[in-house]
């Protein structure tokens, strides 16, 4: 854990498994939101998406822990979210999206990659204090991709 406690600690998160069997977690803390199914129309709207990447810098570790003085994020290390709009026509900027209603899985296709089988579920947006639609999954490199509908 970071000496300055910048990492998530003692947050309970819902765990899901991808179609390939990999565990992934909710982008938001667990709130006991009742499960439900969604339609493609439910997903259209403004989303906040974040992709978690490997840190570009090496860190000194002691027994798996970040050393004192190594806990501050440096330029380029912070994973920043982006706001995107999933349009009702299946477009998202220069990319496209599709939703498998039966399996409740989202796919986003860009010019350079396809992010497949993002798990859609109901959850709580703690920042905006409301129930919302969330997704979690992995990109082709195995990095987490999280999203929450914000409008």
What are these regions (language model features)?
Residues 1-151:
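Carbohydrate-active catalytic/glycan-binding domains of CAZyme proteins
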